[in-house]
Structure formats: structure tokens, C-alpha cells
Amino acid sequence: MADTTGRIPLWLIGTLTGIPVIGSIGIFFYGSYSGLGSSL
């Protein structure tokens, strides 16, 4: 269990970096559909 890559597991890094990316893409598409992102 302690023989992971460094001190932080790789799946935890992927989760913490994946959620904001998916959230940003979701907000971007939501803005495009609602008309807020059409001016970008």
C-alpha cells in the first residue's frame, strides 16, 4: 500500500485533475446551449 508512486496515488491525482476539466467543459457547453457562450 505504501509502495505507490510517491506519496499520492495516481488515481487520486487523476480524479482531482479530471473533475475540474470535466466541470469546465460542462460549463462551456451549458453556456453555449443557453446562449452565454455564443459570444466567445
Swiss-Prot record:
Keywords: Chloroplast, Membrane, Photosynthesis, Photosystem II, Plastid, Reaction center, Thylakoid, Transmembrane, Transmembrane helix
InterPro entries documented for this protein: PSII_PsbJ (IPR002682), PSII_PsbJ_sf (IPR037267)
Membrane topology: Single-pass membrane protein
Gene Ontology cellular component terms for the protein in this record: chloroplast thylakoid membrane; photosystem II reaction center
Listed Gene3D superfamilies: 6.10.250.2070
Compartments (UniProt record): Plastid, Chloroplast thylakoid membrane
Coiled coil: none
Ranges annotated as spanning the membrane: 8-28
GO biological process: photosynthesis
Functional note: One of the components of the core complex of photosystem II (PSII). PSII is a light-driven water:plastoquinone oxidoreductase that uses light energy to abstract electrons from H(2)O, generating O(2) and a proton gradient subsequently used for ATP formation. It consists of a core antenna complex that captures photons, and an electron transfer chain that converts photonic excitation into a charge separation.
Oligomer and partners: PSII is composed of 1 copy each of membrane proteins PsbA, PsbB, PsbC, PsbD, PsbE, PsbF, PsbH, PsbI, PsbJ, PsbK, PsbL, PsbM, PsbT, PsbX, PsbY, PsbZ, Psb30/Ycf12, at least 3 peripheral proteins of the oxygen-evolving complex and a large number of cofactors. It forms dimeric complexes.
Family, per entry: Belongs to the PsbJ family.
Protein name: Photosystem II reaction center protein J
Organism: Ceratophyllum demersum (Rigid hornwort)
